[in-house]
């Protein structure tokens, strides 16, 4: 079986949809729930969270990334893929240079100020992923 453009596009779409559902759940429910964690168990919770969320998120982000690279390469003249890939790079940069360091700080000093900072700092990723999926749906409607 040969992998087609449509197969890659579908994987890209489905990984985006999964990540949209996940990021909005994290933004509205999961991160705010950090405020209710027993401070005595905060280190255990944060360790658990980081391991488990990585197990869920990283495969989806990698699929999205590699599909985005392939789609951009195959269709570099389509602004949907260029804008999508730039959005993806911004999401990755924000994740690893802003959100991950906050999680690391929470491992050492679990406090409400850092949790509020995490909630606030996650909005750009939430907005970018939402923006990106709108671009994909615009492209789908053109096909």
Q: Across the structure, where does each feature detected by a protein language model lie?
A:
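Membrane-interface helix-boundary motifs at transmembrane edges
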Residues: 73-77, 111-112
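Short, aromatic-rich membrane-interface segments at the entry and exit
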Residues: 78-83
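Interfacial loop at the N-terminal end of multi-pass membrane proteins
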Residues: 3-63, 107-116
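Membrane-embedded alpha-helical transmembrane segments of multi-pass integral membrane proteins
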Residues: 15-22, 60-71, 84-94, 98, ...
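Transmembrane alpha-helical segments of integral membrane proteins
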Residues: 96-109
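Individual transmembrane alpha-helices with interfacial aromatic-anchor signatures
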Residues: 55, 115-130
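Juxtamembrane boundary at the C-terminal end of a transmembrane helix
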Residues: 136-143
């Amino acid at each position: 079986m040969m992998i087609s453009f449509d197969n890659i596009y579908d994987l890209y779409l489905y990984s985006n949809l999964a990540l949209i559902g996940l990021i909005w759940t994290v933004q509205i429910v999961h991160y705010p729930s950090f405020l209710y964690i027993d401070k005595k168990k905060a280190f255990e919770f944060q360790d658990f969270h980081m391991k488990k969320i990585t197990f869920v998120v990283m495969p989806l982000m990698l699929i999205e990334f590699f599909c985005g690279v392939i789609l951009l390469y195959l269709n570099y003249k389509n602004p949907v893929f260029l804008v999508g890939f730039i959005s993806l790079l911004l999401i990755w940069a924000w994740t690893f240079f802003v959100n991950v360091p906050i999680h690391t700080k929470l491992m050492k000093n679990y406090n409400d100020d850092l949790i509020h900072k995490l909630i606030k700092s996650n909005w750009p990723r939430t907005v970018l992923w939402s923006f990106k999926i709108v671009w994909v749906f615009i492209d789908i409607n053109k096909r």
